[in-house]
Amino acid sequence: MAFVKTEVQGAVEIITIDRPKALNALNPEVLADLKVAFEAVDQETVRCIVLTGEGDKSFVAGADIGSMSTMTKAEGEAFGKLGNDVFLMIESFPIPVIAAVNGFALGGGNELAMSCDIRICSDNAVFGQPEVGLGITPGFGGTQRLARLVGMGMAKQLVYSALNIKADEALRIGLVNAVYPQAELMENVLKLAGKIAKNAPIAVRNCKKAINSGISLPIEKAVEVEEKLFGSCFETHDQKEGMACFLSREKPKPKAVFTNN
C-alpha cells in the first residue's frame, strides 16, 4: 500500500493515511489502499481500530480537487461510489473504529471521520463540508451522516454555507466526542481504544451491530434486533467468563479474560 500504513499495538490496530504532502487528501488510490488495509485486519486478535492521518496538520483535507477537476459525470459518479463503498465498509466493520482527527477534516475527510464509530480530535482540528463552494455536493455520505449526527437543521446550515468549524464547536454540536491538545491526542485515543479492547469482543461487536441496525428501524423492530443479539451472547465463553468473575467471592475479584469465543 503506497498511501496507507498499519501498526498493531496489542489488540489495537492503527491505520494511518500517509499522504502528508497532499494533506492526506483522498483520491482513488488512497481509497483503494484503505479498503485493502481494512480487509487485512485480523479480526480474531484486533479488537479496536484507530484511523488517523499522517502528520499534525491534517486528518484528511478532503478529496483530491486536482484529480476531480477534470472528471466527467460518469467518472464523478464512479468516484462517489468508490468512496461510499469504502466508507460503508468502515461504518459496518465488525470492530469499533475510532477516528483520531489530527487537523483538517474537510469534505471527504469529515465524511470519513463520520463513518467511524467515535471521533476524537485535537484542538487544532477543523471540520466542514465545503463542496457547494466548489460547485458540487458532498459525495461520500456527507449530506446523510451529518444530519444523523448533529440534526437536520445544523447539517443544512453547515452544508449550505460551506463554513468550517473548529474543534470546540464540533464538540458543542455533537460532531466529535472529545477534544485534546494536539500533543495528547493519540495518547488519549489509544487509552480509549485499550478500554474498548479489554471488553468482551463478541459483545462489543453485537452492540455496534445493534446500534447501527436499529437506528433506522421503528423502536419495536429495533429492540427485536437487540434481543436476538443479547440472546446470542449466552452461547459464548466470554459471557460465562465475565459473569463467573463478577459472581466470584475471591478477594480481589478475578478480572475476566475474554477470548473472543
What are the roles of these predicted feature ranges?
Residues 15, 19, 33-34, 51, ...:
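Terminal peptide-recognition signature
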Residues 89-202, 232-236, 241-244, 260:
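Crotonase-fold acyl-CoA enzyme core
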Residues 30-33, 79-82, 112, 185, ...:
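Hydrophobic alpha-helical membrane-association signature
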Residues 1-52, 88:
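Conserved CoA-thioester-binding segment of acyl-CoA-metabolizing enzymes
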Residues 53-89, 105, 135, 218:
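Glycine- (often His-adjacent) and acidic-residue-rich active-site loop
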Residues 29-33, 82, 89, 188, ...:
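Charged catalytic carboxylate motif
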Residues 1-10, 41-44, 56, 162-168, ...:
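C-terminal alpha-helix plus adjacent terminal tail
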